[in-house]
From Swiss-Prot:
Keywords carried by this UniProt record: 4Fe-4S, Cytoplasm, Iron, Iron-sulfur, Metal-binding, Pyridine nucleotide biosynthesis, Transferase
Entry-linked InterPro entries: NadA, NadA_sf, Quinolinate_synth_type2
Positions annotated to bind iminosuccinate: H38, S55, Y126, I127, N128, S143, H212, P213, E214, T229
Name of the protein this chain belongs to: Quinolinate synthase
Species of the source: Aquifex aeolicus (strain VF5)
Catalytic function, reaction form: iminosuccinate + dihydroxyacetone phosphate = quinolinate + phosphate + 2 H2O + H(+)
Binding site for [4Fe-4S] cluster: C100, C186, C279
Cofactor requirements of the protein: [4Fe-4S] cluster
GO molecular function terms noted in the UniProt entry: 4 iron, 4 sulfur cluster binding; metal ion binding; quinolinate synthetase A activity
Length: 322
């Protein structure tokens, strides 16, 4: 049954899912492997993880683990980050094709060119960047800690990359600094429109609205709360409201309902296909792929030593200031 699932990547029955999950956990114990998963992963993948979290939480866990193998259920830049903070560990990525479109919207060469134009600026990279780009910047941030960290920086000028939505949101909270913001974006978050959210608010006038800062500025204007995935999780499950409209990737719904099933979490219907607020690359990691990767110890993440050394500094600086 397991072999059939691996060959065809067919939709698994509940029994097949349970069987495969047990086998993954057995292998993890046998190989001293830790499985890390982002909130946007499929429910059956989240269920086999030792830890589920957002980018900041996962970076911390990756840096603290004593496991021999890290199986990272997330997109490519997350796996690279795990390798950077744990270069001696074997980091495995269940689907090497699962990249992040936003991370690919800026290159190391473009960062170097920006350095020449803005030599007096502090270069701040969203964690959603490639290892090559991290190696060129001064510090990394996540959506959970960006305002806090940037307020602590001595530089008056900030070059923020690559996410324009997060950059604009942070700039409003840190008005004392000058921002030069790259024009990258997260397609699923940024393509969700003001009009779509207005319609949802009209349909559910009693609902609170929680929005991820990767969303368009006009969408953010309609929010009762703006925060990272983990911050939205805390807000939505504890706010004094029976309904919460949640504008982030639909994978979070699974965790929300597990923590507080007494609330109604409303996600736009357009999330049902690879489009608005549905991350196809996150969903590209399947339970059979996790099983095959761990069983055969394939899809290992490798990076040049000099990139690891240079990219580690901005990540460690972020963790120190968080």
């Amino acid at each position: 049954m397991v072999q059939l699932a691996l060959k065809e990547e067919k939709e698994l029955t509940k029994e097949e899912i349970k069987e495969l999950q047990k086998e993954v956990r057995r292998l993890a114990k046998e190989k001293n492997a830790v499985i890390l998963a982002h909130y946007y992963q499929r429910p059956e993948v989240q269920d086999i993880a030792d830890f589920v979290g957002d980018s900041l939480e996962l970076a911390r866990k990756a840096s603290q683990t004593d496991a021999d193998i890290i199986v990272f259920c997330g997109v490519r830049f997350m796996c690279e980050t795990a390798k950077i903070v744990n270069p001696e560990k074997k980091v495995l990525h269940p689907n090497p094709e699962s990249g992040c479109p936003m991370a690919d919207m800026i290159t190391a060469k473009q960062v170097r060119e920006l350095r020449e134009k803005h030599p007096d600026a502090e270069f701040v990279a969203y964690i959603n960047t490639t290892a090559d780009v991290k190696a060129e910047v001064d510090i990394c941030v996540t959506s959970a800690n960006a305002p806090k960290i940037i307020k602590k920086l001595e530089a008056k000028k900030i070059v923020f990359l690559p996410d324009q939505a997060l950059g604009n949101w942070v700039a409003k909270q840190v008005p004392e600094k000058e921002f030069i913001i790259w024009k990258g974006f997260c397609p699923p978050h940024f393509e969700f429109t003001y009009k779509e959210l207005e319609k949802l608010k009209e349909m559910y006038p009693d609902a609170k609205v929680a929005v991820h800062p990767e969303c368009h500025p006009r969408v953010i204007e309609l929010a009762d709360f703006v925060g990272s995935t983990s911050q939205i999780l805390k807000y939505a499950t504890s706010v004094d409201a029976k309904r919460v409209i949640v504008v982030t990737e639909v994978g979070l719904k699974y965790t929300l309902e597990k923590i507080n099933p007494n609330k109604e979490y409303i996600f736009p219907q357009s999330m049902n296909y690879c489009g608005t607020v549905y991350c196809c690359t996150m969903k590209g990691i399947t339970l059979p792929k996790v099983y095959e990767t761990l069983k055969n110890e394939i899809n290992e993440v490798t990076l040049p030593k000099d990139i690891i050394e240079r990219a580690r500094r901005p990540i460690e600086r972020m963790l120190e200031l968080s």
